Amino acid sequence: GNNPTLYSYVLDTNFWIDLFGLKIIPTVTRGSNNEILTASATISRTDLGTGSATNASSRTYARKLGNIDDDAGHIIGNQLGGSGGKKNVFPQDFHVNRGEFAKFEGNVAEFVNLHGKADIKITFEYANGGTRPTRIHYEATAPNGDKISNSFNNHH
């Protein structure tokens, strides 16, 4: 997984439990309001299908950053090996999260499976300021340079 240390199994056991540190936690840059600006990770074929669902704590966290009916959207999707903990979620409109975003993550999983791995880069826009993104840009790049990308509004 993306655990940056060699000697610990999880980064913070208060957020999630991952006994072997195998879930994907993206590298994230944040703005002055603690809003997510960018996220990146490398997903390998072996990561596919190893992610975890969100939990009550991560859903509460995401809704405090966004709307009361928002999903805790995975930055790196569950099907791509992403953790459901607080360090890998953002406030996402549930229609988008369960619809076009989930479908695109399935396309990314197929892309990773085809190419063996992919570098993921995600950029979040905040047209209204605050901590709930209004638009998400998602790009996956294979080792040979092939790319797939999409952009999503965070409303329906």
Identify what each model region corresponds to.
Residues 1-23:
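Short turn/helix-capping motifs enriched in Asx and small/polar residues
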Residues 26-156:
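Domain-level detector of nuclease and nuclease-like folds
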